[in-house]
Amino acid sequence: MSIMMNLLQPLAFILPILIAVSFFTLVERKVISCMQPRKGPNITGPFGLLQPLADGLKLLFKEPVYPTNSSTTLFILTPTMALSLALSTWLPMPLPFSLVDLNLGLLFLLSMSSLMVFSILWSGWASNSKYALMGALRAVAQTISYEITLSLILLSMVLFSGGFNMRTFMTTQEQIYLIFSSWPLAMMWYISTLAETNRAPFDLAEGESELVSGFNVEYAGGPFAAFFMAEYTSILMMNTLSTILFLNPGFMYTSPTIFSISLMTTAVALSMGFLWIRATYPRFRYDQLMHLLWKNFLPITLAWCLWHISLLVTTSGIPPML
């Protein structure tokens, strides 16, 4: 019985995330169609609600195509690796209870998101296509660059809260949201999450006019669906993390139901911001993308982090501790 429970618990944790990801794709298509003078998916099921199921079945039953000169083993493993790493980033998330309650939950999350770079790089290299390789190199350079900013912002927030555990942020924000005391960091964090998840206007990795489709150009069927789900899982995870860091979803002693509803509502609102930005802004040039980080975000986040450290030292203050 205990073995069965150990198997069912991760499944019960992962399955709602995958369902949310599938319906988020439908919401994206509906929102973008509303922002343009056209209808979205409205044929499959009532109001098009069965469209994600139809898309998933179509992709799963398509025959996967493997390029002749590709590294077949690596070509097959990388989509599975990408989806597994994207799902593993949810493990320390309090939803309201985490599957794995880690004292260094933020470090674990940052490490897992950093490892996703390897799945992108290996998929581009294993495809044996110049377009896939160039898209992979672009994506890796972009992801690694913006991880520096994300890490520095997380360090500043840890100095505010006093720990790497997700629950310490709830204690810190019992009186006031951290977005009010650190709004420049919140603004840079939100823009950096757009770049980290390869979303418009920073979707340089899949520039259709230059690279056909980026690092996943040779993938079809199930492996393509795995990459697609990994990307959208990362989007929802980043927005959930943004909610926990800057917009306290519930007080420490709130009921789990209210906490979950508050967390989901705020995360969905932030995710809708991603869709709005995609429908509004054109794609940046690659040099503008890099200049934004290295010439603007990096100096500001470094200065802000040093300011937080000096503030604690000069006032002999310590952050709140559980």
From Swiss-Prot:
One of its GO terms (biological process) is aerobic respiration. InterPro entries: NADH_UbQ_OxRdtase_su1/FPO, NADH_UbQ_OxRdtase_su1_CS. PROSITE patterns: COMPLEX1_ND1_1 (PS00667), COMPLEX1_ND1_2 (PS00668). The keyword Membrane applies. The chain crosses the membrane at residues 7-27, 74-94, 104-124, 144-164, 176-196, 227-247, 257-277, 298-318. Core subunit of the mitochondrial membrane respiratory chain NADH dehydrogenase (Complex I) that is believed to belong to the minimal assembly required for catalysis. Complex I functions in the transfer of electrons from NADH to the respiratory chain. The immediate electron acceptor for the enzyme is believed to be ubiquinone. Its main location: mitochondrion. GO terms for molecular function: NADH dehydrogenase (ubiquinone) activity. It is found in: Mitochondrion inner membrane. This is NADH-ubiquinone oxidoreductase chain 1. GO terms for cellular component: mitochondrial inner membrane. The keyword Electron transport applies. It catalyses: a ubiquinone + NADH + 5 H(+)(in) = a ubiquinol + NAD(+) + 4 H(+)(out). Keywords: Electron transport, Membrane, Mitochondrion, Mitochondrion inner membrane, NAD, Respiratory chain, Translocase, Transmembrane, Transmembrane helix, Transport, Ubiquinone.
